[in-house]
Amino acid sequence: MVVVAAVVVAAVAVVVVEEDRIKTKYINDIVWKKISGLEFDNQNAELTFSKRLARENRWPQWYALDVIEEYRKFLYLLQRAKHPVTPSIEVDQVWHLHLTYSEFYWEDFAKGMPVKPHHGPTRGGSDEDNKFIDWYAKTLESYEQIFGNKPPVHIWPSKDERFRANQSWAWIDVSKHFIIDRNAGYVYILFIIFLMILVATIF
């Protein structure tokens, strides 16, 4: 039992040392220091970057802040992974918004970076789909290798979920339209039909 316990302790120690080594490697990188030092929220602004991100995506504030932190890691992967990288949909929303703050993006972040951080959307077609699926899978692998832990699934879903078929994204003015979950919507429709039949029966 003593030997087994000693082996377990040694294994845990090795894992901790390895995690510390990985963390030390990227934390001491000048590229990471610049990225981690980016101030996304101007506290003098009534509508800050994170509040705008939360509002445009209908996210709670805490989630918007979490995604921004994952976006920092994506920016680092973009610079240090030895292959093209692809963000999750959530992280991509931060990237899109960051690009609209053009001076902040190109002067405060991109200037002097080893890799020019251009955003290249898909040109469509199965070849492009397969390319981005491959890049995303490699991005998840590099995330774990560089940061020493798996990416959080609530921000970085699996490649199958990230690229599931029949996705349809659109900007909607919620002051003019209701948003109803499709699965729940069927229940609402059946309920309304039931009420209509009930009313017709009574009257």
List the predicted regions and their residue ranges:
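Acidic, Ser/Thr/Pro-rich intrinsically disordered cytosolic tails and loops
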Residues: 1-6, 11-203
